[in-house]
Amino acid sequence: FWGLSLGLGCWRIRVHRSTTGPQDGERPFAPVIVSNHISYADIPLLMLLELPSIVAKSDTAAIPFIGFYARAWQCVFVDRSGKVPSVDLIRQRQIDINKNKDAGWPRLAIFAEGTTTNGRSLIQFQRGGFMSGLPVQPYVLSYRSYSWFSPAFESMNGLPHLFYTLSTLGFAVDILELPVYVPSEEERANPALYAENVRKAMGTYAKMPLADTNCWDKLALLGRGVHRKVE
């Protein structure tokens, strides 16, 4: 994963760990990793920290090479058409991981925004990753480009974006690890509240604003044929 991260231009990677809250062995176990989502480089970057399973779109399984590894990592594939109860799959995986934590089951990484963004703010979180009411480990990723090109994969078609990513001078990446977030009784009973409070905590620690928009707004925009062009 070091090679893949370097190949995607992540030349400088720094991990910043919060010094507040319980440390190391004192930390409660969190079966879920929650992160913002900026680029496809986010996945190998999280893999450098540990080897979690990933929640991914169902069509990811059909992508050559990537689909093979996604299945090997025991990813949870979600169907946005609603034909498969994705929330139930995610919730059950979290419960199974928590029950088998002593057996070394990989944690489940969720990009809670449900899509990629430009990384300048946190859009509203989807509730699926919070339905189990179990603790989560938040991470906040940020990129800084050494050239004019942004690695954010938010509104450019895939092949042009990959071409410019591989052609750029590279990026510096900062990964902020927050304390494990343990939900209150009220948050466990209300996944929407739990998701929003985790988003607020991530925004506060990362000094990142919260945006009043969600992944469906982005999909609606792209559905109208709005894509970013490289000048």
Predicted regions and their residues:
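Generic beta-sheet signal
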Residues: K57, V78, F111, Y139-L141
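Alpha-helix termini
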Residues: D96-G104
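C-terminal alpha-helix
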Residues: A201-Y205, P209
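A short, well-structured juxtamembrane/interface segment
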Residues: F1-P31, Q92-I97, P179
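Catalytic core of membrane glycerolipid acyltransferases/transacylases, capturing the structured
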Residues: L6-L8, G25-S86, Y146-S147
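Eukaryotic intrinsically disordered and solvent-exposed regulatory patches
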Residues: H16-G21, G25-E26, S39-D42, I63, ...
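A cross-family acyltransferase "interaction/gating" segment
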Residues: F65-A72, A103-R107, G114-E196, P209-H227
